[in-house]
Design a protein with these regions (language model features):
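Extracellular/virion structural assembly segments
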Residues: 1-156
């Protein structure tokens, strides 16, 4: 099994499979953050454009696919996902959610991704048992919204 780890806010770094029941399947194959577009200007009497070659890294989304072992009962997967999602934010009296910054360590692809998570809201696939009746495994996709790419490291 491929090991990936997660730190929520300033908490302890934990293995996603043993701690949350999320077994790593795949993730984006990103070697660097995208760059913001170059600033350009052009004039009708001038051929081409003027281009300022200075730019910085831009925000991006990092997608991770996990499977959740349901052990023949979809309710088990629902409970694991709900428990995981509840760790990602705090909620005030008015039901406003404030998301915590997460640090995702993809030891397989040697990347450290820092950003704000989107909760897991739906399954991408259900894998059934050999009789086609029970959901043994539920596949989900999780997104980390990277707002400050300078915190990420693509060579850990």
């Amino acid at each position: 099994m491929i090991k990936v780890r997660l730190q929520i806010a300033d908490g302890e770094i934990k293995d996603t499979a043993s701690e949350y029941g999320l077994v790593y399947l795949s993730a984006d194959s990103r070697f660097a953050a995208p760059i913001k577009g170059f600033e350009k200007s052009s004039y009708p009497e001038q051929p081409g454009t003027n281009l300022d070659p200075k730019t910085v890294d831009d925000e991006f989304e990092y997608k991770v696919k996990f499977f959740v072992k349901a052990d023949g009962d979809l309710e088990n997967a629902n409970q694991k996902i709900a428990a995981f999602n509840s760790l990602l934010y705090t909620k005030d009296a008015d039901n406003v959610k404030t998301f915590k910054q997460v640090t995702f360590y993809n030891d397989y692809k040697k990347a450290k991704i820092v950003g704000y998570p989107t909760p897991i809201a739906e399954a991408t696939e259900f894998w059934r048992d050999s009789r086609g009746k029970q959901a043994d495994v539920v596949c989900v996709e999780w997104t980390i919204n990277v707002n400050n790419p300078t915190l990420c490291d693509f060579n850990i």
